[in-house]
């Protein structure tokens, strides 16, 4: 009788523990939890408010990837800073002049560099560039009559073909204007006084120094890269000890005998 009673108590204990374990599993998954005391209402409200605040705080974070994506799409349509070169164009004609672009549309050269001579050269297509004055914020252009001027808007007149010469100078020819009969290109040029020459002039040729410009750009400081090169060296032969050389013996000076003749 005692064994059967103990067996029943053991089975009831197992059933009770299994039921309690199953209830704990169901509660975190959204199943209705056992009823709580009315005094815990304030705690539940506090927890609900904390949950709402955390969800509201996480909402801008979720929205941030969209904003970042729109920014990346917008930045893809902008000019790449690596495609722009800022500096000056130095023409070696006469005493040497820096190309200048004025806010009023005038273009000429000055021997001394100034803020008007700071230019920005950017690529438009393969071999075609545009030149903009940083201070005047206007583009270098050549009219259909070959006259150089500054334009507030970037048009086809502002496109120039950049070529590199063998003497490390560059030439800039209009991309659309040229002589119709001969097909001769019109180049950007300055005379000996620093005034802009007409590109249609027959004297403006790519071989003349008036069309040669030396780009002077500011190079960004790059960190110095150092490395060590090891060259295999041949083993030097062991140094032999110096043996003092024996001085040659001096031969004794010959003895001279004088013959004496005696006559009886």
Swiss-Prot record:
UniProt subcellular location: Secreted
SUPFAM superfamilies from the UniProt entry: Cytokine
Chief location: secreted
One of the record's GO molecular function terms: fibroblast growth factor receptor binding
GO annotations of cellular component type: extracellular region
Residue positions the entry lists as glycosylated: 108
Function summary: Plays an important role in the regulation of cell proliferation and cell differentiation. Required for normal regulation of the hair growth cycle. Functions as an inhibitor of hair elongation by promoting progression from anagen, the growth phase of the hair follicle, into catagen the apoptosis-induced regression phase.
Recorded family membership: Belongs to the heparin-binding growth factors family.
Record's protein name: Fibroblast growth factor 5
Organism: Mus musculus (Mouse)
């Amino acid at each position: 009788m005692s064994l059967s009673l103990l067996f029943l108590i053991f089975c009831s204990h197992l059933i009770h523990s299994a039921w309690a374990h199953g209830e704990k599993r169901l509660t975190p998954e959204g199943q209705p939890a056992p009823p709580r005391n009315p005094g815990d209402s304030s705690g539940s409200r506090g927890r609900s408010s904390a949950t709402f605040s955390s969800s509201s705080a996480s909402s801008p974070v979720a929205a941030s990837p969209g904003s970042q994506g729109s920014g990346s799409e917008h930045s893809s349509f902008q000019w790449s800073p690596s495609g722009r070169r800022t500096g000056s164009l130095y023409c070696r004609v006469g005493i040497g002049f820096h190309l200048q672009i004025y806010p009023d549309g005038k273009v000429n050269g000055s021997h001394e560099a100034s803020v008007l001579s700071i230019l920005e050269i950017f690529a438009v297509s393969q071999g075609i560039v545009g030149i903009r004055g940083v201070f005047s914020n206007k583009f270098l252009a050549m009219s259909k009559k070959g006259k150089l001027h500054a334009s507030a808007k970037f048009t086809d007149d502002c496109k120039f073909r950049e070529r590199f010469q063998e003497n490390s100078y560059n030439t800039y020819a209009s991309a659309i204007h040229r002589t119709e009969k001969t097909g001769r290109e019109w180049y950007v040029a300055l005379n000996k006084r620093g005034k802009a020459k007409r590109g249609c002039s027959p004297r403006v040729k790519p071989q003349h120094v008036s069309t040669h410009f030396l780009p002077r750009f500011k190079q960004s400081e790059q960190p110095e890269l150092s490395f060590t090169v090891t060259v295999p060296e041949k083993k030097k032969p062991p140094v032999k000890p110096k043996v003092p050389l024996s001085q040659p013996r001096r031969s004794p000076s010959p003895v001279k005998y004088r013959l004496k003749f005696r006559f009886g």
